[in-house]
Amino acid sequence: MGEENQPNYTISQENWSLHRKGYDDQQRHQEKVQEAIKNNLPDLVTEESIVMSNGKDVVKIPIRSLDEYKIRYNYDKNKHVGQGNGDSKVGDVVARDGSGGQKQKGPGKGQGAGDAAGEDYYEAEVSILELEQAFFRELELPNLKRKEMDENRIEHVEFNDIRKTGLWGNIDKKRTMISAYKRNAMGGKASFHPIHQEDLKFRTWNEVLKPDSKAVVLAMMDTSGSMGIWEKYMARSFFFWMTRFLRTKYETVDIEFIAHHTEAKVVTEEEFFSKGESGGTICSSVYKKALELIDNKYSPDRYNIYPFHFSDGDNLTSDNARCVKLVEELMKKCNMFGYGEVNQYNRHSTLMSAYKNIKDENFRYYILKQKADVFHAMKSFFREESGEKMA
């Protein structure tokens, strides 16, 4: 086919800067939302609208560090024109508060009753996916190892091939333009135009099978009478994010839910997050149930095992020595054992007093005293560590 009969593709020369103004403003707003999410993440992860959302796609959450757009009054009243010297950047504050440089207390702060209006906050619609991306970026299962008899494989799609035909949505613009430039240069005219059919390059994908180790997480929660509404909410908030993290980041992680008071039993996920119980507390019962599950269902030769237990620490004193013995037995079969204690008022904890004597490096604990500690507990239990790569 002669060059005159070749179908030509052109590169648009139109100045699209004006068309992008709305898009640029939207991107700037999204950047501010993402920055606000990152700065407020410890408080956001325990927002009731999120924890009680059952994983819905979009939730409304208050972000107090994000102001709505407004015009501010110029207190200085200086004569000026609207042209700057070019040193300002996007996001710079150009208004002043008229306080003469003195730091003022915000509304609703300080001693005595005031007459100032309250501080408004911005209620943003944020997808669970956005929060997960910000939250889970630095988390991973610790000490994950390749196990024997590992036949498990996951399918992974990678854009790792370039072809001359494909979907228009997958066209590789850079490679297409380079191909056209080379062809035109060989003809004596180094230019990106015209682009012919033979210059087109499309990205395409291949399905890659990767070996993957199996893992099981044992979620154990104290549901006794001493665990009040706040304590159970904190424990369930942690396990809510833990299950989201595991299912988002790992293809093959089983989760077993175990609730206990004086007795322990395996429950469904729905019962674990909604059912309330009462009674006394014997924590050794849940460790026995965990060992029973491991012996019957999850061999340490085939599974990476991670037990996590949340309680208020108010255990039967005579049961503490038994708990320590069972935890040490669990750690011989597990990659890591995590204990979270919800202790808002820093009271004496019989269980933590016993656990502080455990010196094993695979035993991790965290005391939660406020809502933001759910975030910090997740970071502590699932922290990334160099050298903890799957062997």
Curated annotation (Swiss-Prot):
Name the family the entry cites. Answer: Belongs to the UPF0229 family.
* Organism per entry: Bacillus cereus (strain ATCC 14579 / DSM 31 / CCUG 7414 / JCM 2152 / NBRC 15305 / NCIMB 9373 / NCTC 2599 / NRRL B-3711)
Q: Which InterPro entries match?
A: Spore_YhbH, UPF0229
Q: Where is the composition biased (Polar residues)?
A: 1-16
Stretches with biased composition (Basic and acidic residues):
21-31
The highest taxon in the source lineage is Bacteria
Q: Where is this region: Disordered?
A: 1-31, 80-117
**Where do Gly residues bias regions lie?**
98-115
Q: What is this protein called?
A: UPF0229 protein BC_0551
One Pfam family, short name: DUF444
Please report any disulfide bonds recorded for this protein chain, giving both cysteine positions: none
